[in-house]
Amino acid sequence: VLSPEDKNHVRSTWDKIGGHGAEYGAEALERMFTSFPTTKTYFPHFDVSHGSAQVKAHGKKVADALANAAGHLDDLPGALSALSDLHAHKLRVDPVNFKLLSHCLLVTLANHHPAEFTPGVHASLDKFLASVSTVLTSKYR
């Protein structure tokens, strides 16, 4: 459960990301594909090379979904219901991949915002991304 302080950290971070969401989302995906090559199996139709238009487009989708979630912290299941259905029933993404992408996103954010990425912010963002992952995998059961 996200505390009021966690929610403030999440909202503040997403405000600071501003127009860089798509860029950071794509960078996190590239980082995931490089660090965890088996994740590429879910994107057989993608050019997963650095700077790929497909990775950039999917990075924007990831960033937009997380921005939506950050705007609905009190109703993550409602905000992410359609994405949960998509990932569970159509795409059938292994739930461990959400943890891998979350880790890569945290590294990306820390790299771009080192001064703001305090231990407290890191912990709050980790809890937020874990909550998002839990919601996205909730319909697997």
Swiss-Prot record:
List, in alphabetical order, the Gene Ontology terms for molecular function in this entry. Answer: haptoglobin binding; heme binding; iron ion binding; organic acid binding; oxygen binding; oxygen carrier activity; peroxidase activity
What is one process in the GO biological process aspect for this record? hydrogen peroxide catabolic process
Which amino acids does the record list as binding O2? 58
Its Gene Ontology cellular component terms are: blood microparticle; haptoglobin-hemoglobin complex; hemoglobin complex
Please list the residues that carry the modification N6-acetyllysine: 16
Tissue-wise expression: Red blood cells.
Identify residues that carry Phosphoserine.
Answer: 3, 35, 49, 102, 124, 131, 138
Phosphothreonine occurs at which residues?
Answer: 108, 134, 137
Q: How does it assemble?
A: Heterotetramer of two alpha chains and two beta chains.
Q: What does this protein do?
A: Involved in oxygen transport from the lung to the various peripheral tissues.
PANTHER family named in the record: HEMOGLOBIN FAMILY MEMBER (PTHR11442), HEMOGLOBIN SUBUNIT ALPHA (PTHR11442:SF48)
Protein name in the entry: Hemoglobin subunit alpha
> What lineage does UniProt assign to this protein's organism?
Eukaryota, Metazoa, Chordata, Craniata, Vertebrata
Gene name per UniProt: HBA
